[in-house]
Curated annotation (Swiss-Prot):
Gene that this sequence comes from: Pdha1
Organism: Mus musculus (Mouse)
Name of the molecule in the record: Pyruvate dehydrogenase E1 component subunit alpha, somatic form, mitochondrial
Modified residues (N6-succinyllysine): 63, 244, 277, 313, 385
Domain of life: Eukaryota
Cofactor(s) required for function per UniProt: thiamine diphosphate; Mg(2+)
Documented activity regulation: Pyruvate dehydrogenase activity is inhibited by phosphorylation of PDHA1; it is reactivated by dephosphorylation.
GO terms assigned for molecular function: metal ion binding; pyruvate dehydrogenase (acetyl-transferring) activity; pyruvate dehydrogenase (NAD+) activity; pyruvate dehydrogenase activity
Keywords on record: Acetylation, Carbohydrate metabolism, Glucose metabolism, Magnesium, Metal-binding, Mitochondrion, Oxidoreductase, Phosphoprotein, Pyruvate, Thiamine pyrophosphate, Transit peptide, Tricarboxylic acid cycle
Species classification: Eukaryota, Metazoa, Chordata, Craniata, Vertebrata
Length: 390
């Protein structure tokens, strides 16, 4: 009897040491999956589009929620570090657009390719890099994903080609990556992203033409967040139907604030490209909460009420959270635990990003040429002047 009482006492003591929320979550029976209706995509030159219902598993839902929260908290931490003058130079944040980067990744394979513009932090994370490598890149430290020399606009990961600072210039490169996929006979696609502000550039239409002519497996994706810097789409474009801009290329207009819509549309587009039909165009209707960059307060060309309305009615994280809680895929307590874990991860990454050393001046020319300096050009050593003083 004494042994039995002692065993019961140990079990109860172990339960008492666990947070009450964890005990509650562990004892609750959750649904394994749930079916949701999603918004129908507008179509251009397509008879059928993505499905209007989709199944979300509990496992995927928790993964998507954690990833979107991580991107959101990472961007808010970057905002804080910038205001503390720890991050310097250009910095473009994507909070509000989390459903785009997470949803696109959910619809493709790790071996597929992605290239985007300068609002790239979220995509760098979803392509597989840890938060500490992203924040360290923002602070210019050696542990950054580009050794601290790329900064906000020039981040890279496996099968992720940046992060490009020239508006629209990544689009022809994306078509070139798709050409390589076809040339090498690989069943891969390239997601080529640009914003509504770049959508009027001539080089994009040239890329459309070559991709269609050669039937390249390229998904052209316009992230329409309504404003190109401080100019609304209505003031910048004769037509704001960006999904029709490819003319002879089929297109989809997608709710970019709903991760499930983005995921299903991406799966559809990827399957279209893999079938050998050529390129397809997607317009993701989304919204950024911050200004264009850190030098833009974001309220001179739009009202605070407009931003708050989007936050209250269309926030991508809240939409996923409500779906999961209401369908018994997760509990509020469980999602709060994820929030706590994400905040700790971000804080740890921020500490690393501020404590990690900066790259020495001698490495300024590294990773530019096939061989690292010092080497002579026309008989002169151009690198001898780059010496650290400490």
């Amino acid at each position: 009897m004494r042994k039995m009482l002692a065993a019961v006492s140990r079990v109860l003591a172990g339960s008492a040491q666990k947070p009450a929320s964890r005990v509650l979550v562990a004892s609750r029976n959750f649904a394994n999956d749930a079916t949701f209706e999603i918004k129908k995509c507008d179509l251009h030159r397509l008879e059928e589009g993505p499905p209007v219902t989709t199944v979300l598993t509990r496992e995927d839902g928790l993964k998507y929620y954690r990833m979107m929260q991580t991107v959101r908290r990472m961007e808010l931490k970057a905002d804080q570090l910038y205001k503390q003058k720890i991050i310097r130079g250009f910095c473009h944040l994507c909070d509000g657009q989390e459903a785009c980067c997470v949803g696109l990744e959910a619809g493709i394979n790790p071996t597929d390719h992605l290239i985007t513009a300068y609002r790239a932090h979220g995509f760098t994370f979803t392509r597989g890099l840890p938060v500490r490598a992203i924040l360290a890149e923002l602070t210019g430290r050696r542990g950054g994903c580009a050794k601290g020399k790329g900064g906000s606009m020039h981040m890279y990961a496996k099968n992720f080609y940046g992060g490009n600072g020239i508006v629209g210039a990544q689009v022809p490169l994306g078509a070139g990556i798709a050409l390589a996929c076809k040339y090498n006979g690989k069943d891969e696609v390239c997601l080529t992203l640009y914003g509504d502000g770049a959508a009027n550039q001539g080089q994009i239409f040239e890329a459309y033409n070559m991709a269609a002519l050669w039937k390249l497996p390229c998904i052209f994706i316009c992230e329409n967040n309504r404003y190109g810097m401080g100019t609304s789409v209505e003031r910048a474009a004769a037509s704001t139907d960006y999904y029709k801009r490819g003319d002879f290329i089929p297109g989809l207009r997608v709710d970019g604030m709903d991760i499930l819509c983005v995921r299903e549309a991406t799966k559809f587009a990827a399957a279209y490209c893999r079938s050998g039909k050529g390129p397809i165009l997607m317009e993701l209707q989304t919204y950024r909460y911050h200004g264009h960059s850190m030098s833009d307060p974001g309220v001179s060309y739009r009202t605070r009420e407009e931003i708050q309305e989007v936050r209250s009615k269309s926030d991508p994280i809240m939409l996923l959270k409500d779906r999961m809680v209401n369908s018994n895929l997760a509990s509020v307590e469980e999602l709060k635990e994820i929030d706590v874990e994400v905040r700790k991860e971000i804080e740890d990454a921020a500490q690393f990003a501020t404590a990690d050393p900066e790259p020495p001046l001698e490495e300024l020319g590294y990773h530019i040429y096939s061989s690292d300096p010092p080497f002579e050009v026309r008989g002169a050593n151009q690198w001898i002047k780059f010496k650290s003083v400490s």
